[in-house]
Amino acid sequence: MKIIIIGGVAGGATTAARIRRSDETAEIILLEKGKYISYANCGLPYYIGDVIEEREKLFVQTPEAFGVRFRVDVRTENEVIFIDRKKKTVTVRLKSEDTYEESYDKLLISTGASPVRPPLPGIDSTGIFTLRNVADTDRIKAYVNNRPPRRAVVIGAGFIGLEMAENLHALGAQVSIVEMGNQVMAPIDFSMAALVHQHLMEKGVNLYLEQAVASFEQAGKEVKVVFKNGQSILADIVILSIGVRPETTLARAAELTIGEAGGIAVNDYLQTSDESIYAIGDAIEFRHPITGKPWLNYLAGPANRQGRIVADNLLGAQIPYEGAIGTSIAKVFDMTVASTGLPGKRLKQAGIVYASSTTHPASHAGYYPDAMPMSIKITFDPQTGKLYGGQIVGYDGVDKRIDELSLVIKHEGTIYDLMKVEQAYAPPFSSAKDPVAIAGYVAENIILGRVKPVYWRDLRDIELKDVFLLDVRTPDEFALGSLPGAVNIPLDEIRDRIAELPS
């Protein structure tokens, strides 16, 4: 069997390796339009910021080494420009602009996603970059080495945007983040993003939220970023991190079905509308395990998982892909931000009734040195307790807790399962009541009606003069600021001062 794979990063390379491990006779051709395959895409911002000092460490495998190890015909700088489904051939363009045709028995599309670059006036000004691949990285790296930036503007506050903000800050730049929405990091709810906002400002990052860019202007060696409200800021370098969209050019030209979310439509076996053509990675859409609606998921973990599954299916298996729930994590200066499943805002958009709990445990036993605070928000079905999503913002131990929440959600578990998870415990690592268990306990109290939560958004609709607002923080904490009309009775004094509470 002759299998052609279009795209050699993440899913494409994984697929090729898996096919070879399963079948020594298959002819495998890997076509990649860039110079590199199998590189650490997620590590690119850290190379720019000198956290990763050696460029070579970004490459998991060179094309030559990969080809030898797995006996794969790796062809870099070979861009597929057309798929002829009737002839079962692809047309490939070389760096020289010459073209050739290659036939296939089975074809895999792993073309990834392309950065959004809106047609704004001045967007081609010197000093404006996107970051998606090694070539982009090399351009940015050369630019900042040649002209160390004093002021940097990052447009877009997703994962890459915040990682670039941190790394440009590490290079000594005064960083400003411009975001059209009212918060950074869209996968989490506003209440959790507010913690990230505070941390960014503590680090000296300027936040311009709910600001849309109208244009760019060259101002000598600087770039002027002009907002739609007329305000403007200057920068030595601008990073566009507005988002990405599925790279479906080839699929559209081949008249493969494109789904309602804009990705290549695939069935449960990652097969497109052509039975000989499969697709994986950022280019595809699939049904969300919770909502059942098509969605796009731009994460390396699911792409590699899809690569393993599709390799077997290309060889004749029928292994279904279970979908992905978007488990993600990012380092934002000293803070770790993670999410899995669906936040409240997306559940609301999907018309799914939910409840939520927010808890603020420590990363490990408080009496052991260096215990750090974390905030955990979970969303769940208010009747059955089925877990829908989790978000964690903290400094230590965030990664293992988000993975526990992800595992429960993937197995369609409930908040009661959070209470039953048996975590390893020792004071340096956790508490006897682990933060995940505490989140489950509080959610159970909400479901059973033992507590009735009032969420921060509810305060906008409450006449505070008509309620007794009790603030149980310490006097020093209360002095830092409180809601109008709040009465301060520290938690440890409530029993002795119970008479002061209204009946």
Language model: regions and residue ranges:
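FAD-site-proximal beta/loop scaffold in flavoenzymes
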Residues: D124-P148, K224-V226, S232-I309, E404, ...
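Beta1-alpha1 glycine-rich phosphate/pyrophosphate-binding loop at the start
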Residues: M1-D73, A165-I188, T327, K400, ...
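Positively charged, proline/Ser/Thr-rich regional signature most characteristic
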Residues: P118-L120, D458-S503
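Mid-to-C-terminal Rossmann-like scaffold of FAD/NAD(P)H-dependent oxidoreductases
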Residues: M1, R21, A283-D396, P427, ...
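Glycine-rich dinucleotide-binding loop and its adjacent helix/turn
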Residues: I109-L171, N206, V266-D268, V487-D492, ...
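Short hydrophobic core segments
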Residues: I5-I6, V80, E102-G112, I155, ...
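Rossmann-like dinucleotide-binding cores of NAD(P)H-dependent redox enzymes
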Residues: F59, R151-A152, F159-F216, L299-A303, ...
